[in-house]
Amino acid sequence: MFVSTRRTFLKAAGAATVAAPCALAQTQAQAPKITTAQLGDNLYLLGGAGGNVVARTGADGVVLVDGGLAENADALAQAVAALPNGGPVRTLFNTHWHPEQTGSNEKLGMAGVTIIAQENTRLWLQQNITWPWNGRKFKKLAKVAQPNKTFYDKGTLDPGIRYGYISDAAHTDGDLYVYFPQQNILAVGDAAYGQGWPVVDWWTGGWIGGIVGGLQRIRSVANKETKIVPGVGPVLTYADIAAQLDMYGNIYDRLNQMINKGHSPSEAVAAKPAKEYEAKMGNPDEFIRRSFESLWAYLSPDA
């Protein structure tokens, strides 16, 4: 995690930027329509809750990877109950601390569900957080909603589920993956994006070099037939991950050269280091600015 001195150093840079719409899913005013698609035997992808949710059903209950936004928790619970062999939820994984992943924590925590997360995710959920670049505030979760089982490196829930730490700093500093070997499905949260540019949450440990490292980790866990479920957007292939790794690797190299030459975030944006990807990915300015700031955060941890 970042120390307070780093936050003081970076706060001015973040506050000076123009607030832009966050790439995280926006709150919906009315009850969402939860969609369901089968990924494999007893494995389903639920969409529309604020982020992708993976559900494994079975005689011993349901395992969820992520829980959508809090305002969609009831609708998601109804959709899960309607799945074949639905049953009660017994385990929830939080792939990281963002509200699109942790919105069902309180509802399920009150029901006695085991909530698993990487230890850094639990620590972030115990405190109030304000993003300095746009002022967005996140309240700490109630005790009952916080992960009640954490790990540092990796673990096994049962023979059909393995999980592990993606990287010490990727999208955040607490990203995890959940792998279903029998179906060859890998859920990775926002360590990979299915659409648009990712959020580089340097305030809670993410950085552009870590995004590259996280994709390398995902590729090492997967194989060429693996289906990869990102935090948002459609299911990805091994080839998609390789393409993302190439793209973010190129951008990281260019930004690293700029910061070593003393460029500012605005100069980095103006240099258009992601120009060849804009037609497919959209306007990268916010992503480039956050990525450049993340280099400051990572390279100057005690500034």
What does each of the following model-derived ranges do?
Residues 42, 56, 66, 96, ...:
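Divalent metal-coordination and catalytic microenvironments
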Residues 2, 17, 21-26, 220-227, ...:
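Accessory terminal helices/loops
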Residues 61-62, 69-71, 166-250, 254-257:
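Metallo-beta-lactamase
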Residues 63-66, 91-94, 162-163:
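Short catalytic-loop micro-motif centered on adjacent basic/acidic residues
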Residues 21-47:
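C-terminal segment of N-terminal export signals and the immediately downstream linker at the start
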